[in-house]
């Protein structure tokens, strides 16, 4: 893909639903560009999500399922049906080695300089072959990881079967949150947060080592561009290993990270998210100005248990 085409894809964010700063502040503009459906780890179908947001008065929405775009067509059809703009989207889990730009990350991250980053893709073609093929590879890797997790907990004496992890009909995406919900429903823990914090469950070192496919961030950005889309860094305040969240060190390192990502083709930054305080969002807007990135906003909605802030 040539530079001009990449620039056009980046600009497509603006025309297809991601607004400039002053537009975000304009009266009546309501957008949510980060939601998850039953095609990944959400509770509602794409149709239900779009209708819900339409009923709440939203103008532009995106269903951005984890590592897959199978729900995009249903979301687009729902947009036509309910009269709301739907941006075709996806969220891809990636890893990036930042030891050359943030040396201290080698001491703060589990993987010696590697940080986990989620990359949102907007205006993608959900039928793009390269995108579909790579998402299938990630799914196959995740399925094998889930079998290992299942075996681990069975060996620890927990009565848990694969079918227990399926929370919605036709669910293809199974991940650690599904294990957490099983532990909640069986009464082993009080809530999902406890399941993730407890070393008896998902915080166990053996479990922590069983990660999803280590897909390089740069490859994900190129994949999104190749599918006609523009790449955006999701929930930057959730990034671990670059300093204490919200500290000056964190934001200084975030600027270094984002500068490198922009060199790779990153087009935007998610500045509003439940993990970001209003003060955090202000600093993220400032970073977007300094780095020349577009901005997006999203609730990261998975279901009624989520806080909604978009």
Stretches found by the model and what they are:
Residues 25-175, 264, 270-308:
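A metal-dependent hydrolase metal-coordination microenvironment
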């Amino acid at each position: 893909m040539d530079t001009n085409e990449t620039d056009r894809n980046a600009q497509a964010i603006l025309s297809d639903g991601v607004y400039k700063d002053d537009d975000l502040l304009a009266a009546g503009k309501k957008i949510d560009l980060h939601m998850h459906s039953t095609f990944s780890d959400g509770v509602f179908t794409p149709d239900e999500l779009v209708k819900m947001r339409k009923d709440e008065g939203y103008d532009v929405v995106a269903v951005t399922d984890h590592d897959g775009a199978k729900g995009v067509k249903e979301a687009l059809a729902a947009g036509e049906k309910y009269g709301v703009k739907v941006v075709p989207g996806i969220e891809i889990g990636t890893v990036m080695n930042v030891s050359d730009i943030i040396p201290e990350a080698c001491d703060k991250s589990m993987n010696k300089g590697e940080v986990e980053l989620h990359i949102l893709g907007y205006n993608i073609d959900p039928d793009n072959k390269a995108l579909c093929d790579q998402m299938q590879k990630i799914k196959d890797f995740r399925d094998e990881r889930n079998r290992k997790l299942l075996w681990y907990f069975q060996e620890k004496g927990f009565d848990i079967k694969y079918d227990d992890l399926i929370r919605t009909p036709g669910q293809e995406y199974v991940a650690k949150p599904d294990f957490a919900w099983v532990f909640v429903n069986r009464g082993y823990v009080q809530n999902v947060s406890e399941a993730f914090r407890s070393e008896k469950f998902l915080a166990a070192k053996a479990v922590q080592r069983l990660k999803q496919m280590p897909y390089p961030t740069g490859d994900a950005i190129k994949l999104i561009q190749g599918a006609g889309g523009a790449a955006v860094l999701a929930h930057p305040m959730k990034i671990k290993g670059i300093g204490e969240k919200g500290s000056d060190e964190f934001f200084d390192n975030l600027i270094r990270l984002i500068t490198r990502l922009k060199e790779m083709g990153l087009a935007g930054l998610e500045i509003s998210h439940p993990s970001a305080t209003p003060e955090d969002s202000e600093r993220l807007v400032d970073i977007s100005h300094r780095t020349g990135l577009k901005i997006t906003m999203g609730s990261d909605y998975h279901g009624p248990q989520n806080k909604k802030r978009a």
